[in-house]
């Protein structure tokens, strides 16, 4: 089973590379640039996750997780900005600033997770039969970020449906 997950993640990473290349070739306007940023952030997250599931120590996994959060922290914000631009909706600049500050704080929290329990409360290996996996006890920043990203994704879906209705 773990080999299947590894193959699937490799395919997703290759698809992200292709998407970044395709977005980079497109005519350069602000919408294309936003989509290229989203694609690049997805590539960072998926490539890091591919490395994470192959890592064999907690220290390696934590290092790769920090790399992964460069993508994770910003994907939803830039996708929301893309959806706003695509549907010709205005977003106040101060709101964009607040969203980017939240993303930066989440990323900093991930990068400094070894010094506090706001991101992960505990991390340890668990063996269940022949399967060994890493168990993570999440801290409040992970839960906050999950709710924050969910709100952003619902906003993207709302904008897409509203744009589709108006078309």
Task: Describe the predicted segments one by one.
Residues 18-27, 83, 161-163:
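C-terminal ends of transmembrane helices
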Residues 155-159:
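Membrane-water interface of transmembrane alpha-helices
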Residues 138, 160-167:
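Membrane-helix boundary/juxtamembrane motif in polytopic membrane proteins
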Residues 123-140:
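Juxtamembrane membrane-water interface segments that cap and precede transmembrane helices
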Residues 2-15, 28-118, 138-151:
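Individual alpha-helical transmembrane segments in multi-pass integral membrane proteins
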């Amino acid at each position: 089973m773990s080999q299947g997950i590894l193959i699937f993640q490799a395919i997703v990473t290759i698809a992200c590379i292709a998407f970044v290349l395709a977005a980079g070739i497109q005519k350069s306007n602000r919408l294309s640039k936003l989509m290229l940023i989203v694609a690049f952030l997805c590539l960072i997250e998926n490539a890091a996750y591919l490395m994470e599931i192959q890592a064999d120590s907690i220290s390696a996994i934590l290092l790769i997780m920090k790399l992964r959060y460069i993508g994770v922290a910003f994907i939803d914000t830039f996708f929301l900005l893309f959806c706003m631009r695509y549907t010709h909706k205005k977003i106040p600049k101060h709101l964009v600033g607040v969203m980017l500050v939240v993303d930066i704080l989440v990323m900093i929290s991930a990068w400094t997770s070894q010094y506090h329990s706001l991101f992960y409360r505990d991390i340890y290996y668990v063996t269940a039969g022949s399967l060994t996996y890493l168990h993570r006890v999440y801290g409040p920043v992970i839960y906050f970020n999950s709710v924050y990203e969910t709100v952003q994704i619902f906003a993207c879906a709302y904008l897409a449906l509203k744009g589709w209705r108006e078309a």
